[in-house]
Amino acid sequence: MSVLGEYERHCDSINSDFGSESGGGGDSGPGPSAVPGPRAGGGAAEQEELHYIPIRVLGRGAFGEATLYRRTEDDSLVVWKEVDLTRLSEKERRDALNEIVILALLQHDNIIAYYNHFMDNTTLLIELEYCNGGNLYDKILRQKDKLFEEEMVVWYLFQIVSAVSCIHKAGILHRDIKTLNIFLTKANLIKLGDYGLAKKLNSEYSMAETLVGTPYYMSPELCQGVKYNFKSDIWAVGCVIFELLTLKRTFDATNPLNLCVKIVQGIRAMEVDSSQYSLELIQLVHACLDQDPEQRPAADALLDLPLLRTRRREMEEKVTLLNAPTKRPRSSTVTEAPIAVVTSRTSEVYVWGGGKSTPQKLDVIKSGCSARQVCAGNTHFAVVTVEKELYTWVNMQGGTKLHGQLGHGDKASYRQPKHVEKLQGKAIHQVSCGDDFTVCVTDEGQLYAFGSDYYGCMGVDKVSGPEVLEPMQLNFFLSNPVEQVSCGDNHVVVLTRNKEVYSWGCGEYGRLGLDSEEDYYTPQRVDVPKALIIVAVQCGCDGTFLLTQSGKVLACGLNEFNKLGLNQCMSGIINHEAYHEVPYTTSFTLAKQLSFYKIRTIAPGKTHTAAIDERGRLLTFGCNKCGQLGVGNYKKRLGINLLGGPLGGKQVIRVSCGDEFTIAATDDNHIFAWGNGGNGRLAMTPTERPHGSDICTSWPRPIFGSLHHVPDLSCRGWHTILIVEKVLNSKTIRSNSSGLSIGTVVQSSSPGGGIGGGGGGGGGGGGEEEDSQQESETPDPSGGFRGTMEADRGMEGLISPTEAVGNSCGASSSCPGWLRKELENAEFIPMPDSPAPLSAAFSQSEKDTLPYEELQGLKVASEVPPEPQRAAGAWPPRLDPAVPCVGKALTSAACACSALQVEVDRLQALVLKCLEEQQKLQQENLQMFTQLQKLNKKLEGGQQVGMHSRGTQTAKEEMEMDPKPDLDSESWCLLGTDSCRPSL
């Protein structure tokens, strides 16, 4: 890295939350790069907001807890490691900071990803990747003396060694590798975590000498108290693999002293079963556990062994594939400083229909087990939770026979949501219900199906019998991962990640889009024009829709009542309209009537269809017998209907269609229902008009009482299931706006304001520490959530413009304390009329923040007296390469003049860059001065209001002392006095 790059990195560290932890001394004034971002011209308005919803607490420790959050921007799960800094010692605070620094350096598929960090008052929040499979320690315990297959051990070994190789290449020694710190996803993807004890070594030959780590995994050199290096991590890797092979700790004892003796002497608790595992694998473990560190192989050497080398490419591709669904980019720069908005919500699942008009809340699906997707079938429901688990149960009335569509291994009718245990360890991404079967997709894009195979919907050519009672994987998609699945009553359509469409099952009316009405028992690829990019598939009862990236809609299957939108109305030359009906189509056909809109969501029902365009408008078409089109009447409609009325001006975000009714949710948290209201379909009893034995409504009517946000909604037959959320409270964490280090935060929270250990020095000096004490967040009466400092703090007064320029506040000034501290500690920057003297304004405090090499170069340059007539762009003078070298340089092969010239050019560019930064700071000072003037005017107006208020209060007190005689006691009470209130 160039010296200039190091300088920019140094500036970034000053701007970061923990810059003073690693920065220079506290005596130096704040340089240009140390100006807090949000206070310099309103930078906070440009900060990115990230929204989080807490799910549940994963675990608690001595100094904090780990909490699972859902990030709403991408619907991903993350872990917040919350550390209470007031309860940490100086060393523990350094460890917390160290973990952030180490994680920020590392990017590898087998290493816990670091996304961000925030500071909430005195709590450090580290946002990390979530591993939903627990840790390797628990995985070994769950084996219950049943040894792992060698293939699985090699798979784990490859991932662990790959992670260790990555951190060693970065010059980092982990120092705490153990099964508790090796995490797993449900797809058996390894993630190495917990870098609080990690240490950066300058080279592979560097040595560390601090006694850290877990005793069971300590190397002999650690036990003996001698220096150690990367080979100590290899020893720990050997202990972990030995544990995988034996399900027992490598070294075990009743006390630490005895344990160290056994480690140094190499007395292992037991030996690996050579009849179960290959000699090559056993020798690899023994090599890692060699008593001599020099004899242990490096991580890269382990990867080059034949045991791993022969399968390395295959396993690397597998790691990349498994990591793809959860991988997301980090923030592009450290200085972005995003704002975290944490919103606590209630999340509940309700069902109705089937004779129950009152929405029924499901107590099983709540709080830590909240839902992220729901689906209704004709006979059953399915729910995917935020932790990617699948629950199913029946919704039918009477004694209808089941066919295994619940996936519990039997045909029992479970009336309450039950976890599909057979999918334990699989992260379910999405589920879809057919008439009597279920199909789901995992995060890895693998497809599982269970239930009736009468029409071949299992996709295995009926080799598993007429019914499949447990989830069965479709090997057809092993090499072609699935992105989305949709089920009709008796057919299945999937969209792969390669944007290919496959369909199988019942082919009646051409619903499979295969240009025939044949049934297919295995997935068949659907021919789609190459110019079209399919982004979603949606099955109706007996038809299928494809949605393109440009918002076009393709449809096939039965077009009864024009529910596919394929009918066309044409005007002839004799001024009469011709209506062309398409009864059904066996290949995907463009729905021309929908081409006027860019469709984003489409929801087919039994007799009608609803769609949402890119502007949030709702479109309906199909049968209107029960008013299910929502147009205000029950007349036959031939074309596409754009809904107004109660939905006019609203943006619809969710819609679903049942047999003769429609449910929709809007962005202003309202839920509407219309159509056939019989048997509780609409969750109400409308009285608009009777229709036969049922009660219908043709206008969208609000239901469900108070306002609720609807993340997902599904209707099928006469049933509805939806997720509703309600905001409880919210808080904003402006972590990087304070610019506080760990040490400064802890000091500011101490009662006496004394100096705490470890963290005070750096960028802002003592003035910033005092500032942090005054800027503590205001506690909220409601309890846990607080507002930001700037929002809750009142303005006591404002400095005058003259005082602002002079950078002084007298004792009688109304300048607030926080502003006075900033002005007292700020660097005075002159305001020149021309940019020529800018080179002289390069302050000594700014130089002190530079890296050592630049600082030395600038000091040497400053010893040369400057020429007043020389412009800033002409300094320093260029060396003439034609001038011959003298002395020993004459005998050298290459003259050093060219290298010196490069160094001078680099320093010149560095100085010019600093001058540009100073110009920017001058502009920011002007903006701040303008803002101060505006605030001063507002303050004067506020003072006038205050004087008027005091005058009103005086008049009120006079009235209380001498009430008007023409008012009785009751009317006097209305004026707000206390004379009429009964004593307590």
Curated annotation (Swiss-Prot):
Phosphoserine modifications at: S2, S13, S16, S20, S76, S331, S741, S808, S839, S949, S983
Coiled-coil residues: 896-945
Positions bearing N-acetylserine: S2
Residues where Phosphotyrosine is found: Y52
Residue numbers spanned by region Disordered: 14-43, 744-790, 940-984
InterPro entries (alphabetical): Kinase-like_dom_sf (IPR011009), Nek9_STKc (IPR042767), Prot_kinase_dom (IPR000719), RCC1/BLIP-II (IPR009091), Reg_chr_condens (IPR000408), Ser/Thr_kinase_AS (IPR008271), STK_NEK (IPR051997)
Amino acid composition bias (Basic and acidic residues), ranges on this chain: 955-967
Assembly and binders: Homodimer; homodimerization is required to activate NEK7. Binds to Ran GTPase. Has a greater affinity for Ran-GDP over Ran-GTP. Interacts with SSRP1 and SUPT16H, the 2 subunits of the FACT complex. Interacts with DYNLL1; phosphorylation at Ser-949 strongly reduces DYNLL1 binding.
Protein's UniProt name: Serine/threonine-protein kinase Nek9
Record organism: Mus musculus
Encoding gene, per UniProt annotation: Nek9
